[in-house]
Amino acid sequence: MAQHAAKPAPVTVAPVPVTPESAPVGAPLAPPEPTVTQAIEPQPQLEERAITANENVVPHIALLLPLEDKNFSEAAQAVRAGFMAAASLNPFGLPVQVYSKFDENLNVVAEYRQAIANGAQAVVGPLTRKGVSALAAEQVIPVPTLALNTVDAHPAENLFFFGLPADDEARTVAELAARKNLHNAVVIATTSPLAQRLQFAFEEAWSKLGLNIVREIDFKGEPSVLNGLFTIPNPAASKPSATPDDPPVPDVLVIPDTMVFLATDVENARRIRPYLPAKLPTYATSQIFKGNDDTLTNYDLNGIHFVDMPWLLQPDNPPVVVYPHSATPLSADQERLYALGIDAYRLVQLMLAHTLAVSLPLDGVTGQVQLSNHIFQRTAVAGVFSQGRAQSTASATTPAIQMFPDQFKNQP
C-alpha cells in the first residue's frame, strides 16, 4: 500500500459574532461560539484517501459542507453559520469540526470515513443531492448521520434526511386550501423543473383529498391568456335596470369554491396576479417571498396566500427568539438555509441522545418537524401579502422548549 503523508494539524476557524449594530431588534446576541476546526490537507487529486490511524482522535460532531465549491459555497456558508449559531448556545455539547476539502460529486464518502476515523460521534451533511445519494448507497453508517437533502433511497439504520424540499410546501398549501372549504383548483405553472415539481406535488395532494383539478395552465410569460378565464357569465347582467339610478349589474361572477395555485417564481407571480380577480383565493409556496425589504414591489402580490418557515414569518415565535441571527445581511434564500442549520443542530443533538421518539414533533425555526421513514419532514406556517408586506396568518405557539437534551451534557 502506498505511504500517505501525515496530515497537517487542523486549523482553527474563528466564528463571526453577532454585533449589536447588525442584529435585528429583539434578537439575542450570540455568545462566543465553540472552537471550530477545519480539517485541511494537501489534495492534489480528487480521489478517495485511505484512512490511517489517527493518534489525535477527538470526539466531535462532523459538519460536511462544500464550502469551497464555487457552485455551493454560498449555501454551505449559510448552513454553517446557522449550525454554529445553535452550537454557541450549547456549551455542554461536543465540539464541531468542519470538513470542506472534498468534492461532493467525487469523494464525499471518503471524507465521511475520514471524519469517523477522526472521532466523529455524529455527522451532519453532505448538502447536495449527489453527495447525499452517494452516502445513501453505503451499506454501513456507523454513527448518527443527518444528510442535509432528501433522496429516494432505502438508507442504513443511522442515516436520516433533512432538507427544505419545495414539494412539502406544495402539499401543505393543498391542505390549507382544503381547510378553507375550497373544492376546485386551477393550477398555473411555468415550465421550469422546480415549477413542475410543485405542480405535481400539489395536484397529487389535492387529488388525495378528493378535490378537483379543473384546469392546468402552462404559463410562458404572457398574462393575457388569463383574461376572462376565472369568470362565468352573470345572467342578471342581461336584465335592464329597474331605474336609471340602480347600480350596474356586474358582467361576471367568480367561480365559487375555486382557488388558484401558482407554481411559479416571484417574477411570474407578479405578472399573473393583476389578471386574477381580487377575491379569488390564490396560493403559492415560499418561492414568491424574497423578504419584506421592497414593499412597493410586493404590492403586486397583495392577497396571495403562501407558506414559509417561522424564521421568516413569525419573529416572535419562541424558538425564533432564542437563536441569534446572522451578523451579516442575508437574502431570504440564505436565511432559510441559516434556519436549516439551526434545526439540523437541534436534531443531531436528539439523535445523539436517542430521544427522537419522545422529542418529536420539534417546534423548529423551519416549521414543525416530524420523522417519517428516516426523513425529517417540516410543516411550514401560513402567510399572506397585505399592504406590500408578508405576514403570518397563524398565531405563534408557546410550547415548552427544550433546546438540548440534558442526557448529552459532558460531565466534569
What feature does the model see in each segment?
Residues A137-I141, N184, R197-F306:
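Extracellular/periplasmic bilobed ligand-binding domains
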Residues D69-A81, L194-Q196:
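Glycine- and acidic-residue-enriched helix-capping/strand-helix junction motifs
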Residues V79-V98:
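Signal peptide-proximal N-terminal region
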Residues R273-I342, L356:
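Extracellular/periplasmic periplasmic-binding protein-like sensory domains
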Residues H325-A394, Q411-P412:
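Segments of small-molecule ligand-sensing domains
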Residues Q121-E216, F289-G291:
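Extracytoplasmic ligand/sensor domains, especially the bilobed periplasmic-binding protein
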Residues M1-L63, F72, L226-P247, T379-A382, ...:
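Compositionally biased, proline/threonine/alanine/serine-rich low-complexity intrinsically disordered stretches
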Residues P95-Q114, E169-T172, G221-D246:
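Structural motif
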